[in-house]
Amino acid sequence: HSFPTRRSSDLVAQIGTKKISNIMGFYSIPDFMYNNRFSGEETILRFNEFVKKVEDKEKPDIIIIGVPEPILPLNKKHLFSFGIRAYEIYQAVDVDYCILNLLSGEYSDQFETEMKNVCKYRYNVDIDDFFVSNFSIVSNSLYSSELKYVYVQMNALPKSKNFFNADDLKDERWFNKIEARLKKYSMFEQF
């Protein structure tokens, strides 16, 4: 994909979900997020400190933070830490714009409403957009130790203006929407 060109003065810092994120030129979620060495409160405070250090070092216009696991368990075999990582991250930082990534599937207006409520009341974050990928879980891997994924043709997206997919990355509309929202926040930013 080609991404829209931005001003050379724009600086983005990214905290990725994989340990190998450093290879791609951005930060990785710290190891302490994955062990039980610290209490939940300590983990939240430490992650906040980590993000602050990134901010102080890079002085970015935007910090993109990937959440390393799904926000809800899939089944009894794949619990995804019950969304605890997401909870800790969302408590550690104030989110200006949140995009929830979804596997390929058919999504309704009711789904959008319910997921926004789950995120608002469980994680204290408002979902701005849903990004629907071209990947789906191979059904016979649901109960194996490792999930397998398959690339699928994109289903039609709901009529909601809050659903996007890879095709939307080919033009600037989605980026412009995000940029416009963030600019509104920056007008009222307090230091």
Predicted feature locations:
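Conserved catalytic-core segment of NTP-binding enzymes
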Residues: 43-53, 62, 67-166, 174
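Hydrophobic anchor at the start of a short beta-strand
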Residues: 9-13, 127
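A structural signal for short, well-ordered beta-strand segments and their strand-loop junctions
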Residues: 12-16, 63-65
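Short, small-residue-biased leader/transition segments that mark boundaries at the very start
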Residues: 3-8
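NTP-binding/hydrolysis catalytic cores, primarily Walker-type P-loop NTPases
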Residues: 157-191
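Short, surface-exposed amphipathic charged segments that create phosphate/polyanion-binding patches used
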Residues: 27-32, 142-151, 175-185
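Gly/Ser/Thr-rich loops at beta-strand to alpha-helix junctions
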Residues: 1-2, 18-21, 69-71, 106-107
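P-loop NTPase switch/communication element
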Residues: 19-40
